[in-house]
A protein has these predicted regions:
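Generic hydrophobic/packing signal
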Residues: 15-17, 25, 51, 76, ...
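A glycine-rich, hydrophobic loop/mini-helix early in the fold
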Residues: 58-97
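Generic detector of intrinsically disordered, low-complexity, polar/charged segments
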Residues: 47, 65, 74-76, 140, ...
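Active-site loop/lid in soluble adenylation, ligation, and acyl-transfer enzymes
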Residues: 1-70, 74
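Catalytic beta-strand/loop module used to bind and position nucleotide/cofactor moieties
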Residues: 81-83, 88-173
Length: 173
């Protein structure tokens, strides 16, 4: 078991959120930081685009601009995510790769098990569904994405609780 530094929940804009994760990855890589779990929100609401996606393919940029929603690219893969300022908590887990299972599916399960434990402690009957989702009943409430770079793993994840679904579908393609 390793000790992690926990950064409590804070709101930042999309660009600051992604820059913080990149800076933390670099500090973990150089040994200047313990592994980190960071909880955060997006102010204003934002769309994060997976590393390998085309921004214009995934987001209606005119609608996002009109709604005051930032659009940013993540370091992690996966699909486009709408981050509702008032409806979700995002987490980043950043640590040396040797702290996590090498197998991608097992590493998602390893990290999501802790998210499940926290949700179940709060009375939420949630379950992990491979490869990287957490469901309550048949409703997805959490998804995550990873990257591994220079010996460091970064996993982003969201836990949804009150998303403006109408706005989300207006902005995501």
């Amino acid at each position: 078991m390793s000790i992690f530094r926990m950064i409590p929940f804070q709101y930042f804009d999309a660009f600051t959120n992604m820059a913080l994760d990149e800076a933390i990855m670099e500090r973990v890589r150089t040994g200047e930081s313990l592994p980190v779990i960071r909880f955060y929100g997006w102010q204003p609401s934002a769309v994060s685009i997976g590393f390998f996606q085309g921004i214009r393919d995934e987001a209606n940029l005119a609608e996002a601009r009109a709604a005051g929603v930032n659009v940013v690219r993540r370091q992690t893969g996966g699909g486009a995510v709408y981050h509702d300022q008032f409806g979700e908590v995002t987490y980043s887990i950043i640590g040396r790769e040797d702290l996590f299972p090498r197998n991608i599916l097992k590493s998602y399960q390893f990290i999501c098990d802790d998210i499940l434990f926290a949700l179940q402690t709060l009375g939420v009957n949630a379950r992990f569904v491979p490869i990287n989702d957490i469901l309550v009943g048949e409703q997805k409430i959490s998804g995550s994405a990873q990257t591994r770079r220079n010996g460091v793993l970064l996993q982003h994840g969201t836990v949804l609780y009150n998303v403006d679904v109408e706005r989300m579908f207006a902005i995501l393609n």
